[in-house]
Amino acid sequence: MRIGHGFDVHAFGGEGPIIIGGVRIPYEKGLLAHSDGDVALHALTDALLGAAALGDIGKLFPDTDPAFKGADSRELLREAWRRIQAKGYTLGNVDVTIIAQAPKMLPHIPRMRVFIAEDLGCHMDDVNVKATTTEKLGFTGRGEGIACEAVALLMKAAK
């Protein structure tokens, strides 16, 4: 078994909506990013890549490459997952924690889980997504941005 941890953060800027966990969420602010700014999928992709010792999302999809400008993070996750499977890994489970004062994530979490399960080709029971606030402390608490942490468990596929 191999465990990976991922983290991502994006500042608010411009107009919304935002995309979190593949879900378009209406909000008056957008997130500043080279890609679509999906902190949940970026953290998850990093966790998966880390567990497989394949580096991180910035190594695979550098923000200096114009090809990834405005990229769909679901496609980045699927491509990373293809590479991880090619190394002989299967998924144990993933756990994602979104850290945001606003907007409220709870109504969108079921769809996030569906999208992540689809992209990883796994059962919904293998995907957990939750959200929390920082009780108005720090940059997320002041409404300056959104952060996310993710953990992934991989196992070597049976031969």
Curated annotation (Swiss-Prot):
<feature type="binding site">
    <location>
        <begin position="132"/>
        <end position="135"/>
    </location>
    <ligand>
        <name>4-CDP-2-C-methyl-D-erythritol 2-phosphate</name>
    </ligand>
</feature>
<feature type="binding site">
    <location>
        <position position="142"/>
    </location>
    <ligand>
        <name>4-CDP-2-C-methyl-D-erythritol 2-phosphate</name>
    </ligand>
</feature>
<comment type="similarity">
    <text>Belongs to the IspF family.</text>
</comment>
<dbReference type="InterPro" id="IPR003526">
    <property type="entry name" value="MECDP_synthase"/>
</dbReference>
<feature type="site" description="Transition state stabilizer">
    <location>
        <position position="133"/>
    </location>
</feature>
<dbReference type="InterPro" id="IPR036571">
    <property type="entry name" value="MECDP_synthase_sf"/>
</dbReference>
<feature type="binding site">
    <location>
        <position position="8"/>
    </location>
    <ligand>
        <name>a divalent metal cation</name>
    </ligand>
</feature>
<feature type="binding site">
    <location>
        <begin position="56"/>
        <end position="58"/>
    </location>
    <ligand>
        <name>4-CDP-2-C-methyl-D-erythritol 2-phosphate</name>
    </ligand>
</feature>
<dbReference type="Pfam" id="PF02542">
    <property type="entry name" value="YgbB"/>
</dbReference>
<comment type="subunit">
    <text>Homotrimer.</text>
</comment>
<protein>
    <recommendedName>
        <fullName>2-C-methyl-D-erythritol 2,4-cyclodiphosphate synthase</fullName>
        <ecNumber>4.6.1.12</ecNumber>
    </recommendedName>
</protein>
<feature type="binding site">
    <location>
        <begin position="8"/>
        <end position="10"/>
    </location>
    <ligand>
        <name>4-CDP-2-C-methyl-D-erythritol 2-phosphate</name>
    </ligand>
</feature>
<comment type="pathway">
    <text>Isoprenoid biosynthesis; isopentenyl diphosphate biosynthesis via DXP pathway; isopentenyl diphosphate from 1-deoxy-D-xylulose 5-phosphate: step 4/6.</text>
</comment>
<dbReference type="GO" id="GO:0008685">
    <property type="term" value="F:2-C-methyl-D-erythritol 2,4-cyclodiphosphate synthase activity"/>
</dbReference>
<feature type="binding site">
    <location>
        <position position="139"/>
    </location>
    <ligand>
        <name>4-CDP-2-C-methyl-D-erythritol 2-phosphate</name>
    </ligand>
</feature>
<feature type="binding site">
    <location>
        <begin position="100"/>
        <end position="106"/>
    </location>
    <ligand>
        <name>4-CDP-2-C-methyl-D-erythritol 2-phosphate</name>
    </ligand>
</feature>
<comment type="function">
    <text>Involved in the biosynthesis of isopentenyl diphosphate (IPP) and dimethylallyl diphosphate (DMAPP), two major building blocks of isoprenoid compounds. Catalyzes the conversion of 4-diphosphocytidyl-2-C-methyl-D-erythritol 2-phosphate (CDP-ME2P) to 2-C-methyl-D-erythritol 2,4-cyclodiphosphate (ME-CPP) with a corresponding release of cytidine 5-monophosphate (CMP).</text>
</comment>
<dbReference type="InterPro" id="IPR020555">
    <property type="entry name" value="MECDP_synthase_CS"/>
</dbReference>
<feature type="binding site">
    <location>
        <position position="10"/>
    </location>
    <ligand>
        <name>a divalent metal cation</name>
    </ligand>
</feature>
<dbReference type="GO" id="GO:0019288">
    <property type="term" value="P:isopentenyl diphosphate biosynthetic process, methylerythritol 4-phosphate pathway"/>
</dbReference>
<keyword id="KW-0456">Lyase</keyword>
<dbReference type="GO" id="GO:0046872">
    <property type="term" value="F:metal ion binding"/>
</dbReference>
<feature type="binding site">
    <location>
        <begin position="34"/>
        <end position="35"/>
    </location>
    <ligand>
        <name>4-CDP-2-C-methyl-D-erythritol 2-phosphate</name>
    </ligand>
</feature>
<dbReference type="GO" id="GO:0016114">
    <property type="term" value="P:terpenoid biosynthetic process"/>
</dbReference>
<keyword id="KW-0414">Isoprene biosynthesis</keyword>
<feature type="binding site">
    <location>
        <position position="42"/>
    </location>
    <ligand>
        <name>a divalent metal cation</name>
    </ligand>
</feature>
<feature type="site" description="Transition state stabilizer">
    <location>
        <position position="34"/>
    </location>
</feature>
<feature type="binding site">
    <location>
        <begin position="61"/>
        <end position="65"/>
    </location>
    <ligand>
        <name>4-CDP-2-C-methyl-D-erythritol 2-phosphate</name>
    </ligand>
</feature>
<keyword id="KW-0479">Metal-binding</keyword>
